[in-house]
């Protein structure tokens, strides 16, 4: 593993243990050249996924990009980081288990929205505002009104 501080390719693993999400290995590394210490994570990847964008463009699935968009939606919400990590790992496992390596971005967005809706409504609305490309306050109002249970009809 290359040292992120000095570029040395000869680093040493000082400690390995399961990460908090229990689906990856956390490794503490040391660079003998500069004395730098850093952490890496190792995860199992069942298959190489390709995202099919709405434009038809294809790009490799990037777990980091998925994680970043979810963390932005969850920003300043009272959700434990471990729960977010578990949710992300669950989404990736679900994508890998779909049986196809080519996955439309729409499918990924829908799976993320399902997961967010179960955990935090505010994060769900935040993510939806970007995913569904809200342009005005009316878009938010319509979306949120669909979330609210309808009042029982008077007889």
Swiss-Prot record:
UniProt keyword annotations, A-Z: ATP-binding, DNA-binding, Metal-binding, Nucleotide-binding, Repressor, Transcription, Transcription regulation, Zinc, Zinc-finger
Its job: Negatively regulates transcription of bacterial ribonucleotide reductase nrd genes and operons by binding to NrdR-boxes.
Family to which the UniProt record says this protein belongs: Belongs to the NrdR family.
HAMAP family reported in the protein's UniProt record: NrdR
Highest taxon of source: Bacteria
One MF annotation (Gene Ontology) recorded for this entry: ATP binding
Residue ranges of coiled coil: none
One GO process term, biological-process aspect: negative regulation of DNA-templated transcription
Domain ATP-cone positions: 49-139
Cofactor binding note: Binds 1 zinc ion.
Requisite cofactors: Zn(2+)
A Pfam family this chain is assigned to: ATP-cone
Keyword field contains Zinc: yes
Zinc finger boundaries on the chain: unnamed: 3-34
Protein name per its UniProtKB record: Transcriptional repressor NrdR
């Amino acid at each position: 593993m290359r040292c992120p501080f000095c570029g040395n390719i000869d680093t040493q693993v000082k400690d390995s243990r399961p990460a908090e999400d229990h689906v990856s290995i956390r490794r503490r590394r040391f660079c003998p050249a500069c004395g730098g210490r850093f952490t890496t994570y190792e995860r199992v990847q069942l298959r190489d996924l390709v995202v099919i964008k709405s434009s038809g463009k294809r790009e490799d699935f990037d777990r980091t990009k998925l994680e970043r968009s979810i963390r932005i939606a969850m920003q300043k919400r009272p959700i434990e980081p471990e729960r977010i990590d578990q949710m992300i790992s669950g989404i990736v496992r679900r994508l890998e288990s779909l049986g196809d390596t080519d996955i439309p971005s729409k499918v990924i967005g829908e799976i993320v929205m399902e997961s967010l809706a179960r955990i935090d409504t505010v994060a769900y609305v935040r993510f939806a505002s970007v995913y569904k490309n809200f342009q005005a306050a009316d878009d938010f109002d319509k979306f949120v009104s669909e979330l609210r249970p309808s009042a029982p009809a008077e007889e």
